[in-house]
Amino acid sequence: MQTLIAFLVMFGVLVSVHEWGHLYFAKRAGILCREFAIGFGPKLFSWKRNETVYTIRLIPLGGYVRMAGEDPELITIKPGYEVGLVFNEKNVVSRIIVNNKSKHPEAQVVQVERIDLERELFIEAYDDDGERKRWDVDPKAEMVQDEEATQIAPYDRQFGSKSVAQRALAIFAGPLMNFVLAFVLLAAYGFMQGIPVEDPVVGNIAENSAAETAGLQKGDYVLSIDGQTLETWVDMTMIIQQHPNEEITFEVERAGQILQIPVTPNQVEGMDGEPIGLVGIERPAPEPATLVSGLQFGATQTYTYMTMIFDVLRLLVTGQFSLDYVAGPVGIVNYTGQAAEMGIFVLLQWTAALSVNLGIVNLLPLPALDGGRLVFLGLEAVRGKPLDPSKESLVHFVGFALLMLLVLVVTWNDINRLFL
């Protein structure tokens, strides 16, 4: 239960922040945002605030902001249709009743002759006496079908009416907010826990550990292992983990002397089930954070996570890293549970790492992702006109289908690795 709760909270935060970036900058550009959704599939909860419906959906695999003009309107009214019109105090159409008109006795039933709900905002129709009349339509008028109201979207409120720069910012803002979230989480970690010591210095040593048996001491500065020069604590731990049950030689500086100390790391099981080496040393105690060092830590750690993720992507593309080791939804849930068991501070770091990952993956130039949409906007800027919307939608649909197929593959890998 703890694992599930931790995952749902983390997922909600990551996706909410990402989609809020889209929502905020889209609204700043004047785009009508019809829905802000966390999750996909059937709707679990919903509420409406101002012009936007906020929904929580069943499948926790992402989220979306539905902007007017990105997809064809679900309700169309053509000449010859009978609709009910509800007017405001200025005799301007405020609601258009598409069906079930008998449930709206306040509506005047008319037969549509001409209608424009995008640019001129008017309805011409014949009333009960056969007289043809014209009414202005409120820019925020609603169409009611099956007792569900949908606000109309004049052209100047649609995604396509905005400049390339405005649309690009609305799309890029999602990944950008993930990077900002990672920075905030890591800076908060630094302020609460202190700034971790990056140098390869030995901290506390566990009793009866490989390090104690070999003669390592607290305060030893590790210069190299088996001739490999070290710059950071992470460099040291990675080399140790790569040599379970294998003797390696630590070159350490102690009280001005250089010592060569052979150590044989114990073999333990890593988070992914693979064997790793462990010598039983801890990192030195963190240093108290100042305002500057805390913010600097948040920025440098965010950058470090970004470079690590780019390195993995490069290895994937070049075939040097197997897709079998990429965690899918099941793997992420499992690792989130392990992070939660280790404490709130480990969970903070894990959430920050996933936030950076979400931001970078979304910027990949692939259909259905934010990066793919930015590519289409770039092509529009070069050509001076947008591509055929139907063709672009088809590309994104195919891309989304392939993305879901990839999710299924890595999910199977998760199940095979963790449970079979």
Swiss-Prot record:
Domain named PDZ: residues: 182-267
UniProt topology in membrane: Multi-pass membrane protein
GO terms for biological process, alphabetical: proteolysis
TM spans (from-to): 5-25, 168-188, 315-335, 344-364, 392-412
Keyword Transmembrane helix attached: yes
Active site: E19
PROSITE patterns according to UniProt: PDZ, ZINC_PROTEASE
Cellular location(s): Cell membrane
EC number, as in UniProt: 3.4.24.-
Reported cofactor(s): Zn(2+)
Pfam families from the UniProt entry: PDZ_6, Peptidase_M50
Family matches, as SUPFAM superfamilies: PDZ domain-like (SSF50156)
GO cellular component, one term: plasma membrane
Binding locations of Zn(2+): H18, H22
Similarity comment: Belongs to the peptidase M50B family.
Function: Is responsible for Site-2 cleavage of the RsiW anti-sigma factor. This results, after a third proteolytic step catalyzed by the ClpXP protease, in the release of SigW and the transcription activation of the genes under the control of the sigma-W factor.
Protein name, as recorded: Zinc metalloprotease RasP
Species the sequence originates in: Halalkalibacterium halodurans (strain ATCC BAA-125 / DSM 18197 / FERM 7344 / JCM 9153 / C-125) (Bacillus halodurans)
Encoding gene, per UniProt annotation: rasP
